[in-house]
Amino acid sequence: QGSHGVRTSYQESFNFSQWGCGTLEGIPTFCSEQMIISPVGLDNEFTALRRLGIDDPFLLLSIDPNCICATPYHMISSQLEELLLGKNPRGTIGTGVGRACRMFHESGDTLTLRAIELTDKTLIRKKLQRQCEYYRAKYDEAVKTSILPEDMAIAEDNLALLADDGYLQYCLELFEAIGKRLKFMDLPEALCQAGTAIVECSHGVLTDAGMGFSPHVSAIRTLPKYTNEMLRTAGYDGRIINLAVHRAYEIRHGAGPMPTYDRNFTEAMLPGSHKDENRWQGIVRAGALDLNLFRYALECCKETPIDGLCLTWFDQIIKNNRIWPICSAYEGKTSIDKNDVDFLKNTACPVIQEHAIPQTSNDFELFRVVKEILRQYIELPLTML
């Protein structure tokens, strides 16, 4: 729900967070009630998709009426919470998804806005007002006493929005406009549509609230067993194929352990991306594919075993002199230095092997080479799509 970067076979690129990754191919999206939608995100993404030539993106979108809405007030809370951590970052995208989830678990529907309520102007105003008042009471004093001096300007800008009636009115009007465009559907109805349903999950396994590396985790559960339970509860009794999706290298935007982080590799893979950092999410880091973390992620999923691997972004390896670095083990004592400027950089040394990818324009030959390399390290089916 931060964004999924997609490049189509005809070289169109887009970052999706509300619509599914198949939108540019005309594939419709259904947001289940486990999805936390953002009316602001919907508005922004709608405008961007229109620029790409999709006349009305909302015709390709249906939403469960029970979806929780992340509001600008959740976004403000997310960013302030990170600033309050000072020099001990947890890391957050800063869009309010986690805060919306936590608010629901703490306060239920008293403060939480549901997708179906976007059709009721009175309810929108009431719940936005309640959220605003809740966060003003929570942060007014905390910001004055606990924010680092260098973060005070950002914090004060966020507090000002909590006190701005004009901002509340802006949110109300935007939410009401989005509510008029939404098409509602529940999961059983969505599963009755013709074709194959692809369930696109929004967070990695290692950000799972229960199995990830705390505190650098999401507020939600990200394991495939929860997706499978959702489908079974809806009455689906057919075949489910669980696919792991992973880049050909490691990437992390923000705080958290990342043993293979390499500044030079980051610049080679994502030139200039480190300049896109913000205070609450932090820097973009990339490094060698870490099969130690990958094996742990597979272990986390053992209740619902993974059937195969989708390896993505391999075109960047090709562009990087066809050298594919892979880490399969660590050397030395594995420990964490919490004062490290590189955000909990592992003090153990990753053992990295570099694999040369032969010059070839044949996709099938490339797939064969990649498959043979991975077979040295993991036992998991790899299929070319």
Regions found by a protein language model. Name each.
Residues 1-385:
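Non-transmembrane, aqueous-exposed alpha-helical and coiled segments at domain scale
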